[in-house]
Amino acid sequence: MDWNGRDVISIRDFSKSDIEFVLKVAERLEEELREKGSLEYARGKILATLFFEPSTRTRLSFESAMHRLGGSVIGFSSASSTSVRKGESLADTIRTVEQYSDVIVIRHPMEGAARLAAEVAEVPVINAGDGSNQHPTQTLLDLYTIKRAFGKIDGLTIGLLGDLKYGRTVHSLAEALAFYDVELYLISPELLRMPKHIVEELRERGVKIHETTDLEGAIPELDVLYVTRIQRERFPDEEEYLKVKGSYQVNCKLLKNAKETLKVMHPLPRVDEIHPEVDKSEHALYFRQVFSGVPVRMALLGLTLGVL
C-alpha cells in the first residue's frame, strides 16, 4: 500500500499487514537510532502538533520522533493560547496550520475531531487521541512493546484492567489484538465495562474473552496486564467517579500470584493503580513502553511523509 500522504485516524483503518509493516519499520529505525543517534530522513519537513487536551508522553514523543528524523516541529500544547479562544472553528484552524506544515498531529476532546481534520486537510493527519474514541499510535507502540518483550503476540493471554468504558487506549488496543491469536481478560468495575459493541465485535472476530471484576482471580492466567487509570475527566457525574475511584491497585503482593514472566504495562499517567514498588520489579514494562513511542511514531511520520 502507498503510505505517502496517508492519514492515521483509527486502528480500524489498519489491516494486520499494515500493523506488522509499521512494527518492522519501527524496529529498523530503533536500530538505526542506537547506531547513529539521529537521522536525516525528514530534513526540511515540518510537523505541526495541535494539542487541545493535556499530554506529556504523546506530544513529547511525537516531537522527539520528528527531531530524531531530522525534521522540525511547530504547534501548541493548549488551545487557550490560540484563536480557538476567539471562536475559530476546528476546520479553519486545520486549514491555517496546514499552510505551515507537512504533517499534522492532533489531540482533541471531541470524538471524531481527527477524522474531521483529515477531511479538511490536504497534508496527512495523525490522531493523537479524540475524546474516549481512538488512540491508534498508542496502540501501535503497545503492540511493538509486547512484541519486543515476548518476541510474539500470538498465543498470549492479555488482561485489560481499569477504565474500559472511557479509556480510548484499551478500545484501540482490543480492536488491534483481534488480529492475533490472543485470549483477553477484561477486568473492570461493573460501571466501567468495555462497551458492549466492542465486546460483541471482538467475539465475532473469534477472540476468546473473559469479562470479570476479579483481578486476583485473573492474575495467574496472564502474560500481560495492561493497566489504565480511572479517567476522571471523562465522567459526566462526579458521584459516579467516586464510586469506582481506587477500584484496583497492582502491587507486589498481588504479583506474587502472577507468572514470573508477566509484564505490566500502562499508557500513563498513573495515579494510584500501580504502586511505585512495582517499578523496580522484573514485571514492570511501562517505562520501556514509553520509549517505544519514539521509534513507532518515527515510523508513522516517515511513512506518511513519504521519506521512508
UniProtKB/Swiss-Prot annotation:
Alphabetic keyword roster: Pyrimidine biosynthesis, Transferase
Q: Which residues of the sequence carry a binding annotation for L-aspartate?
A: K86, R168, R229
Please report any disulfide bonds recorded for this protein chain, giving both cysteine positions.
none
State a single Gene Ontology molecular function. Answer: aspartate carbamoyltransferase activity
Q: Where does carbamoyl phosphate bind?
A: R57, T58, R107, H135, Q138, L268, P269
- InterPro entries, per the entry: Asp/Orn_carbamoyltranf_P-bd (IPR006132), Asp/Orn_carbamoylTrfase (IPR006130), Asp/Orn_carbamoylTrfase_sf (IPR036901), Asp_carbamoyltransf (IPR002082), Asp_carbamoyltransf_Asp/Orn-bd (IPR006131)
Pathway in which this enzyme or protein is active: Pyrimidine metabolism; UMP biosynthesis via de novo pathway; (S)-dihydroorotate from bicarbonate: step 2/3
Please give the catalytic activity noted in the UniProt record. Answer: carbamoyl phosphate + L-aspartate = N-carbamoyl-L-aspartate + phosphate + H(+)
> What are the GO BP annotations of this UniProt entry?
'de novo' pyrimidine nucleobase biosynthetic process; 'de novo' UMP biosynthetic process; amino acid metabolic process
- Which Pfam families does this entry report, sorted A to Z? OTCace, OTCace_N
Question: Which EC number applies?
Answer: 2.1.3.2
Query: Domain of life, per the record?
Result: Archaea
State how it assembles.
Heterooligomer of catalytic and regulatory chains.
Can you tell me which family this protein belongs to? Belongs to the aspartate/ornithine carbamoyltransferase superfamily. ATCase family.
**General function of this protein:** Catalyzes the condensation of carbamoyl phosphate and aspartate to form carbamoyl aspartate and inorganic phosphate, the committed step in the de novo pyrimidine nucleotide biosynthesis pathway.
Record's NCBIfam families?
Answer: asp_carb_tr (TIGR00670), PRK00856.1 (NF002032)
Indicate what this protein is called per its UniProt record: Aspartate carbamoyltransferase catalytic subunit
What species is this protein from? Thermococcus gammatolerans (strain DSM 15229 / JCM 11827 / EJ3)
Q: What is the lineage of its organism?
A: Archaea, Methanobacteriati, Methanobacteriota, Thermococci, Thermococcales
